[in-house]
């Protein structure tokens, strides 16, 4: 017969086909302007990148390397730093939205999304968060935008309100299973409220950004300080176990009568998005938080280095969450036996996550103020 020569399927293609969308956790004007292997367009063509996430730390780093922003900043002299940051970041995000709009259309709005964060100083203010999210939504003015709202207690009702208004939300800084469940329900509340308002659910999407590596970064040192021989075996297990158990919550809610009713009315599932997936510990494979968290209806947003680490991974790519719930539970049972409190760790991580973004925002203001 005829010999067909099929190209080998790349690792990134396999990950994508298994249901995990690959997004780039980075954005800068140079990625939008240049036409080399670091550009956003190049990564969409060669590395299966189908979305972009940003945060205050990312913009702070981008603006420190300011050569590509000189003209933009010069044009904003006389404006205050907050206004300048808003204008510069929304311009970058709008350009990124335009560059990946074709992916948005090809995937019926599931991918091809770019996320921009509300000012982290508003993390504990529900109304101020809603107001700024509306402003960002109308200023960027692109259907393929996500507004990032932190999963604080104040953030939850803000998420419900924004979804009700038809604004697509990326819920960020989720560390605990309990809070993740509340996020899913806040999303369903928003969809239900919108249906009760007599509006349709067309075009409304959401992702829930569940943070991964920071859990190991917090728990591993506690294990290293332990004398119990079991402690060593638990290194590098908590973060993946936590994310896998989050997926179990996602599956449970996705099978609920309430969700099936909303889905029947056109609601889109809120996908779990694995964030903070760069490996901080040299003892681990640099793609650990990618290859161990592959499952349908998920997103993994990665720094560029992690995308390349995943690309060069030679092991098997398969649904790596299925069948792991019992062993994941066991990880936390053992941690508890060693006196490591899950609740204490995740509560501290949320507080720390907000203050990190807060500090990055202050750094951003300082960087811009110096140039205005």
Where are these regions (language model features)?
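An N-terminal structural lobe/cap that precedes and organizes the functional/catalytic core
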Residues: 21-23, 35-71
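Catalytic alpha/beta core domains of metabolic enzymes, predominantly
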Residues: 167-305
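Hydrophobic faces of well-ordered beta-strands that scaffold small-molecule active sites
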Residues: 20-26, 50-54, 112-118, 145-149, ...
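Flexible, acidic glycine-rich loops studded with aromatic residues
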Residues: 266-372
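Glycine-enriched alpha-helix->loop->beta-strand junction motifs that scaffold or abut catalytic
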Residues: 48-49, 141, 158-169
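Active-site-adjacent beta->alpha loops and helix N-cap segments on the catalytic face
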Residues: 33-34, 125-130, 149-163, 176-188
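Short, small-residue-biased leader/transition segments that mark boundaries at the very start
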Residues: 1-7
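Active-site beta->alpha loop and helix N-cap motifs at the rims of alpha/beta catalytic domains
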Residues: 54, 58-158
């Amino acid at each position: 017969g005829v010999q067909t020569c099929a190209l080998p399927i790349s690792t990134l293609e396999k990950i994508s086909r298994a249901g995990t969308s690959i997004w780039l956790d980075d954005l800068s004007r140079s990625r939008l302007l240049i036409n080399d292997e670091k550009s956003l367009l190049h990564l969409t063509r060669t590395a299966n990148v189908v979305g972009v996430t940003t945060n205050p730390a990312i913009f702070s780093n981008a603006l420190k390397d300011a050569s590509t922003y000189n003209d933009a900043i010069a044009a904003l002299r006389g404006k205050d730093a907050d206004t300048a940051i808003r204008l510069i970041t929304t311009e970058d995000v709008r350009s990124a939205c335009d560059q990946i709009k074709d992916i948005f259309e090809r995937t019926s709005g599931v991918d091809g999304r770019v996320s921009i964060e509300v000012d982290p100083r508003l993390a504990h203010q529900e109304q101020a968060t809603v107001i700024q999210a509306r402003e960002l939504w109308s200023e960027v003015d692109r259907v393929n935008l996500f507004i990032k709202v932190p999963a604080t207690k104040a953030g939850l009702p803000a998420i419900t309100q924004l979804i009700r208004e038809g604004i697509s939300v990326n819920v960020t800084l989720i560390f605990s299973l309990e809070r993740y469940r509340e996020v899913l329900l806040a999303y369903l509340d928003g969809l239900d409220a919108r249906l009760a308002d007599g509006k349709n659910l067309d075009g409304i999407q959401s992702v829930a950004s569940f943070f991964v590596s920071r859990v190991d970064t917090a728990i591993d040192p506690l294990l290293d300080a332990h004398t119990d021989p079991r402690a060593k075996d638990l290194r590098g297990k908590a973060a993946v176990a936590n994310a896998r158990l989050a997926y179990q919550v996602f599956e449970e809610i996705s099978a609920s009568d309430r969700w099936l009713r909303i889905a029947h009315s056109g609601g889109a599932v809120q996908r779990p998005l694995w964030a903070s997936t760069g490996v901080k510990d040299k003892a681990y494979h640099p793609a650990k938080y990618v290859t161990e968290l592959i499952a349908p209806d998920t997103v993994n947003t990665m720094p560029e280095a992690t995308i390349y680490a995943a690309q060069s991974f030679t092991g098997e790519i398969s649904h790596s969450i299925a069948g792991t719930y019992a062993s994941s539970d066991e990880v936390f049972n053992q941690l508890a036996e060693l006196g490591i409190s899950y609740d204490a760790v995740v509560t501290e991580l949320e507080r720390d996550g907000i203050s990190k973004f807060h500090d990055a925002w202050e750094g951003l203001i300082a960087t811009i103020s110096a140039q205005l």
